[in-house]
Amino acid sequence: MKIISKIIVILLAASMLQACQGPGGMNKQGSGTLIGGTAGALLGSQFGGGTGRLAAVGAGALLGAILGNQIGAGMDEQDRKLAELTSQRALEAAPSGSSVQWRNPDNGNYGTVTPSKAYKNNTGQYCREYTQTVVVGGKQQKAYGTACRQPDGQWQVVN
């Protein structure tokens, strides 16, 4: 029971620290670092005694923070991968004005890409203007840009 109480206190403290980050809070990578480090320190405190225990707490905190950071970064990366794959698919095959959607089932983030009519630029590349809408943590962001088809078939953002 003693360890469960410690875990609850540490998670509450981590939540309060995250809330101090202001509007939007801490990103997933920062949250993962904080929670992983806290959990690692708690786990490390269960080993050794005296200076040995102190070393175990430090090592546990460091390893937990590294692992938590990587897990948080992977989640953000998944959103970017889904958005990029959807952009490529929309620019290559979607009719003008038709939105193609992506959704990350792990965190609920989602977005759409809506391309306009394709045209050839002055170097002969096919290009399309597009609108991209992304909703992360319930907050919507919209961006406009132009992408051109490269010789390898990939679309590259040019502005």
Curated annotation (Swiss-Prot):
A lipid is attached at C20 (N-palmitoyl cysteine). It is a lipid-anchor. Residues 1-19 form the signal peptide. InterPro entries: Anti_2, Bact_OM_lipoprot/Surf_antigen, Gly_zipper_2TM_dom, Surface_antigen_Rickettsia. One of its GO terms (cellular component) is cell outer membrane. Its main location: membrane. A lipid is attached at C20 (S-diacylglycerol cysteine). Keywords: Cell outer membrane, Lipoprotein, Membrane, Palmitate, Signal. It is found in: Cell outer membrane. It holds the Pfam family 17kDa_Anti_2. PROSITE patterns: PROKAR_LIPOPROTEIN. It comes from the Bacteria. Belongs to the rickettsiale 17 kDa surface antigen family. PANTHER family: OUTER MEMBRANE LIPOPROTEIN, PTHR35603. This is 17 kDa surface antigen. It comes from Rickettsia bellii (strain RML369-C).
